[in-house]
Each structure stands twice: as structure tokens, then as C-alpha cells.
């Protein structure tokens, strides 16, 4: 689902000698170099290669995540209680690329859809998922824009890949295909249009997993093109991975995350 836009914050409190300049930023524990993000705060990690974004956009209940500054994060508390109906309370995530004009360093994105081949964009992601009474998914959120850049939300296509979910939730829109084979796994496919804006296509794994390794995004992009949801002239601008949470979510964790972009001539 689409996040509404949030405020952007930086990763620490910076004080210059003499007290002439002070920048107030998310709380940092110097003892363990832990950055805590709440509400819609973000921070740059892995020397700017990725951004961690708490992105609580659908709930006013307290939710916070922490990160060590590497390509990882965990949900340390969440009182989100949106239940099984309606939109999630948030989407704590990590991303590479540009989101609402906030871009990571050296991402290799954007990249035009027409130039994407097998192995051009791959991703690995390891998670921990608590189960229990929590309602959530573990999902990629991949954004395509009609032009090369945008300072707002992408206006082409939102392509989601649910690698797992817990609780009675299914993707936005209507099921358009079932047991579709992509990259050696099977997926149910859902699509929902949004008036005057982008559409959302979701590939839900029929057998959920907690991790993926070298997931090739090309077969998903090609499938979306074949269904008429994605144009080859559009641009892939960001790859996100995280957890849409409808109920609770404490203990959800991204253990590691990477996106590799190979530009081929």
C-alpha cells in the first residue's frame, strides 16, 4: 500500500563547539551506536548507500525502530492496532534509490525499464518475523515513475512482492492470476488501480519465506509489462523492503538487505 508522505529527519544530534549551531535529530545511543526512529523519521545507513525509514503513515499509535547504521533495522515497540480491515499503520523499511525526492548515494537508479535484463537489478533480504497475534506482511515495494525523476511519489506503478504475511490480510486490489511461476517460485497476482494516479500490482508468494537471495527483479517487471501495468519507457526509481503492519509488529527485523544494479551496454 502507498505511504502518505512524512517528515524527513537526520541521524544524530550535532553540536558545534561554542554553541553557535545546534541541529536536533533522532535519538542516538552512543554506547551501542544505535539510532532510534519513531513516527516518520528516517536515517542514512551504510555510508549513504541505503535509507532506513520508519514511515508510520496510517496510525497515530507509538511505533519505533532502531538501526545500528548498517543495512538493517528492527521494530522495538509498536502499539499499532488497525486490525484486519483497511490500510496498514505503517511500513518500516529500508530502501535504495529515490523516495519522495530523497535519494541514496551511488544507487545506480533510476534505470529505464527498457534496459532491464536478467540480473540487471537483484536483491537479497533476510528477516526475522515474530508471528503471534501480530498482523503484517514482509514485502518489497518497488516504484516506477513515468519520467526519470520526481520530487513526489512515483506516478507510474507500485510493484509489491510479498515474501510472507501473518494474519488475515491479502494484497490491495483484486486477484488477477494464481500460481504464476516466476524465478522458480509461485505467486498469486493482484492488481488495483488508483484514479488519476499510479496502479499497484502485487505478487504474493504462495509459500512464504523469511529470506530471499539474489532475487532477480527482471521477471516481475517483465510480467507487469506483459499484463499492461508497466510501460518500458518508465523508470525504476527505488527498491524498498519492509513490513506493512496492521496489528503490533514488535520483533519484526531486517537482518540484512542489499540491492545490486548492473548497468549493461
What does each of the following model-derived ranges do?
Residues 37-42, 168, 236, 256-258:
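Carbohydrate-recognition beta-sandwich/jelly-roll modules
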Residues 73-77, 119-127, 140-142, 236-245:
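Short, hydrophobic/proline-enriched secondary-structure or compact coil segments at domain edges
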Residues 92-177:
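Extracellular-facing segments of soluble proteins and assemblies that are Gly/Ser/Thr-biased and enriched
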Amino acid at each position: 500500500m502507498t505511504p502518505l508522505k512524512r517528515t524527513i529527519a537526520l541521524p544524530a544530534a550535532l553540536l558545534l563547539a561554542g554553541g553557535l549551531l545546534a541541529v536536533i535529530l533522532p535519538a542516538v545511543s552512543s554506547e551501542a551506536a544505535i539510532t532510534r526512529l519513531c513516527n516518520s523519521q528516517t536515517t542514512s545507513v551504510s555510508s549513504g548507500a541505503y535509507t532506513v525509514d520508519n514511515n508510520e503513515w496510517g496510525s497515530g499509535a507509538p511505533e519505533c525502530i532502531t538501526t545500528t547504521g548498517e543495512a538493517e533495522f528492527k521494530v522495538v515497540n509498536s502499539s499499532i492496532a488497525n486490525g484486519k480491515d483497511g490500510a496498514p499503520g505503517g511500513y518500516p523499511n529500508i530502501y535504495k534509490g529515490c523516495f519522495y525526492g530523497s535519494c541514496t548515494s551511488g544507487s545506480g537508479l533510476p534505470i529505464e525499464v527498457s534496459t532491464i535484463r536478467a540480473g540487471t537489478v537483484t536483491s537479497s533480504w533476510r528477516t526475522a518475523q515474530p508471528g503471534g497475534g501480530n498482523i503484517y506482511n514482509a514485502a518489497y515495494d518497488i516504484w516506477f515513475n513515468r519520467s526519470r525523476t520526481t520530487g513526489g511519489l512515483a506516478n507510474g506503478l507500485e510493484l509489491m512482492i510479498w515474501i510472507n504475511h501473518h494474519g488475515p490480510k491479502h494484497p490491495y486490489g483484486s486477484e488477477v492470476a494464481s500460481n504464476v511461476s516466476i524465478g522458480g517460485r509461485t505467486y498469486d497476482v493482484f492488481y488495483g488501480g488508483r484514479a488519476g494516479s499510479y496502479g499497484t500490482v502485487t505478487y504474493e508468494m504462495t509459500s512464504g519465506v523469511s529470506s530471499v537471495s539474489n532475487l532477480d527483479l527482471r521477471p516481475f517487471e517483465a510480467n507487469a509489462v506483459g499484463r499492461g501495468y508497466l510501460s518500458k519507457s518508465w523508470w525504476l526509481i527505488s527498491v524498498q523492503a519492509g513490513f506493512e503492519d496492521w496489528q503490533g509488529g514488535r520483533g519484526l527485523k531486517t537482518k540484512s538487505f542489499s540491492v545490486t544494479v548492473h548497468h549493461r551496454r
